[in-house]
Swiss-Prot record:
<keyword id="KW-0325">Glycoprotein</keyword>
<keyword id="KW-0732">Signal</keyword>
<feature type="lipid moiety-binding region" description="GPI-anchor amidated serine">
    <location>
        <position position="225"/>
    </location>
</feature>
<feature type="compositionally biased region" description="Low complexity">
    <location>
        <begin position="207"/>
        <end position="225"/>
    </location>
</feature>
<protein>
    <recommendedName>
        <fullName>Retinoic acid early-inducible protein 1-delta</fullName>
    </recommendedName>
</protein>
<keyword id="KW-0449">Lipoprotein</keyword>
<feature type="glycosylation site" description="N-linked (GlcNAc...) asparagine">
    <location>
        <position position="66"/>
    </location>
</feature>
<comment type="function">
    <text>Acts as a ligand for KLRK1.</text>
</comment>
<feature type="signal peptide">
    <location>
        <begin position="1"/>
        <end position="28"/>
    </location>
</feature>
<dbReference type="GO" id="GO:0009897">
    <property type="term" value="C:external side of plasma membrane"/>
</dbReference>
<dbReference type="InterPro" id="IPR050208">
    <property type="entry name" value="MHC_class-I_related"/>
</dbReference>
<dbReference type="Pfam" id="PF14586">
    <property type="entry name" value="MHC_I_2"/>
</dbReference>
<feature type="disulfide bond">
    <location>
        <begin position="37"/>
        <end position="52"/>
    </location>
</feature>
<dbReference type="GO" id="GO:0042267">
    <property type="term" value="P:natural killer cell mediated cytotoxicity"/>
</dbReference>
<dbReference type="GO" id="GO:0046703">
    <property type="term" value="F:natural killer cell lectin-like receptor binding"/>
</dbReference>
<feature type="propeptide" description="Removed in mature form">
    <location>
        <begin position="226"/>
        <end position="249"/>
    </location>
</feature>
<dbReference type="InterPro" id="IPR011162">
    <property type="entry name" value="MHC_I/II-like_Ag-recog"/>
</dbReference>
């Protein structure tokens, strides 16, 4: 019994490391000059919340919890407000779609402690004249994880259980289309704002937002450094996996 419990803990640890590995490279691409939107859906209550940031700048906050809606930072350029206003209705529509999907998704209630809650992160880097694309990360009750890359129309799950849910969601053509084209209508405004945020000197007196989980340093001028950062993250996680397997032996 004791050996089985230890083995179970090792499998759980390895699974978590694999989840980190799954998202390591994507997180390496998220920086101070990408648009990041965090969506929180708490089924079955009507509680939805959306926060969109560019680095430390909050450009949009939607909440039906306390009925608040803010768009843009008064201390920043008018472009931030324009981006927030452009994204407002598409994100509201997406929240409703996500609410319907998570409410109709069968999950292990022992893992979710009842009704599942959904956290979604959308990361949009400047398109630089190319077709606008984004990365969508889905987290259901910290138990089911999968990612959708609109640029290559590719889905990736963290484990088999997550894959079952992911496959059902990706078979919804209207939902996939909604994810892919949500940012297209606002891409010109977003690119202009991201370009300005790169050119604007960063304040040294401002405390970073708690939602900014990655480095707040400016985006390097080439993609090589970004790729290097992603691969370093993957390498560190791979080393952790080796230790996990060694302890499991």
């Amino acid at each position: 019994m004791a050996k089985a419990a230890v083995t179970k803990r090792h499998h759980f640890m390895i699974q978590k490391l694999l989840i980190l590995l799954s998202y390591g490279y994507t997180n390496g691409l998220d920086d101070a000059h990408s648009l990041r939107c965090n969506l929180t859906i708490k089924a079955p209550t009507p509680a939805d919340e959306v926060k969109c940031f560019v680095g430390e700048i909050l450009i949009l906050h939607l909440s039906n919890i306390n009925k608040t809606m803010t768009s843009g930072d008064p201390g920043e350029t008018a472009n931030a407000t324009e981006v927030g206003e452009c994204l407002t209705q598409p994100l509201k529509d997406l929240c409703q779609k996500l609410r319907d999907k998570v409410s109709n998704t069968k999950v292990d209630t022992h893992k979710t402690n009842g009704y599942p809650h959904l956290q979604v992160t959308m990361i949009y880097p400047q398109s630089q004249g190319q077709t606008p694309s984004a990365t969508w990360e889905f987290n259901i009750s910290d138990s089911y994880f999968f990612t959708f890359y609109t640029e290559i129309m590719s889905w990736r799950s963290a484990n088999d259980e997550s894959g079952v849910i992911m496959n059902k969601w990706k078979d919804d053509g209207e939902f996939v289309k909604q994810l892919k084209f949500l940012i297209h209508g606002c891409s010109q405004k977003m690119d202009e704002f991201l370009k300005q945020s790169k050119e604007k000197p960063r304040s040294t007196s401002r405390s970073p937002s708690i939602t900014q989980l990655t480095s707040t340093s400016p985006l390097p001028p080439t993609s090589h450094s970004t790729s290097k950062k992603g691969f370093i993250s993957v390498g560190l996680i791979f080393i952790s996996l080796l230790f996990a397997f060694a302890f499991a032996m």
